[in-house]
A protein has these predicted regions:
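Conserved acidic residues
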Residues: 208, 253, 267
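N-terminal small/polar loop signature for handling phosphorylated ligands or for N-terminal nucleophile
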Residues: 174-232
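A glycine- and small-aliphatic-rich helix-loop capping segment at beta-alpha/alpha-beta transitions
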Residues: 171, 226-234, 286-292
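Glycine-rich phosphate/diphosphate-binding loop of Rossmann-like nucleotide-binding domains
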Residues: 112-116, 140-191
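Short amphipathic alpha-helical segments
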Residues: 164-166, 222-226, 283-284
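C-terminal binding/interaction regions
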Residues: 1-39, 46-57, 68-148, 159-160, ...
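Short, acidic/small-residue loops that bind anionic groups at enzyme active sites
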Residues: 229-254, 293-303
Length: 307
């Protein structure tokens, strides 16, 4: 199965249909709820709902998801019934397969209950397809429409001294690159408050996004938050709340992060944890919001300006 552990949860909905063709007298039986086996539409609705809830047991590589809503509705025509299934969840992946499975099994249930009333060649299913979906990467974009200049500053005495390689900062650079940020300034600093303050103020004149990596913990040398928080003119607390909530589901140590985010003039500053896992998890949680911020606020600074 595909690993969806690093995908943030979001509201998702999918709508699917299936069409069952049948002789007109069978469609009338559906309207009356009067087949040999009982009310076919009511029975099929229950079957479709159960199918949505158990899709992961039927389709081998489909992820189990909490189903918050599963509905099956019908449109009865002269010689066919259109089955429409709607499924909703809040999760890391979509419910397209759940909606398709619900529509399919509802159709098969109706087929089973109508077959005593007609010849086999008079019943067939068609046009089982997804009608629409909402949520996830198709709705919450993770790639910029236009490039945005970003800077990544790694704060670590040991990395700056060459005693340990940087992995967290490079993972942030990689994520930003994949999201369309360009150019990206990358720099390593020791945990020195004045050096960090001066660099961030200078970079804020040319870079719309400044990401610091490291110095958000509770150690004596963790000076990033104490240095940058007083500089923030407009705080954006929701970014780090999202990052901590996402991280807390993966490690209890996420609660120790003091990270902050906000604007210095028109430059967004975000302080990330210094561990590879903490930085990666934080980026996974906040990237859709980052992309939205910079797609909306097109007057943010960029070297050379925007055309």
């Amino acid at each position: 199965m595909k690993n969806v552990g690093m995908k943030p949860e979001s509201y998702r909905v999918a709508e699917a249909q299936a069409i069952l063709y049948a002789p007109p007298h069978c469609i009338e039986l559906l309207r009356q709820g009067n087949t040999e086996k009982g009310d076919a539409l009511k029975t099929a609705r229950v079957a479709g709902i159960l199918a949505a809830k158990r899709t992961d047991e039927l389709i081998p590589l489909c992820h189990p998801l909490p189903i918050y809503r599963a509905d099956v509705e019908y449109e009865l025509e002269h010689d066919f019934v259109k089955i429409i299934a709607v499924v909703e969840t809040i999760g890391p992946t979509g419910v397209e397969m759940e909606a398709l499975t619900a529509a399919s099994l509802a159709g098969l249930t109706i087929y089973d209950m109508l077959k005593p009333h007609c010849e086999p060649e008079e019943l067939w299913m068609d046009q089982c397809k997804l009608l629409k979906k909402k949520g996830g990467k198709s709705h919450f974009k993770r790639v910029l429409r236009q490039p945005v200049a970003a800077a990544v500053i790694v704060l670590s005495d040991t990395v700056a001294a060459g005693r340990k390689p940087d992995t967290a900062g490079k993972s942030v650079v990689e994520t930003l690159t994949e999201a369309g940020f360009d150019p990206i300034h990358y720099q390593i600093l020791p945990d020195e408050a004045d050096t960090l303050k001066n660099l961030v103020l200078e970079l804020s004149k040319s870079y719309a996004c400044i990401m610091t990596v490291g110095g958000t913990g509770i150690g004596k040398r963790d000076i990033t938050v104490d240095t940058l928080e007083p500089l923030l003119e407009r705080k954006l607390d929701g970014l780090m709340e999202a990052a901590r909530s996402f991280g807390q589901k993966r490690t209890p140590y996420a609660a120790m992060s003091r990270g902050v985010a906000g604007f210095i003039d028109r430059s967004l500053v975000v302080t990330l944890p210094g561990s590879r896992g903490g930085a990666s998890e934080s980026m996974a949680a906040i990237l859709p919001a980052l992309v939205h911020i910079f797609d909306v606020c097109r007057d943010l600074p960029h070297p050379g300006g925007y055309e």
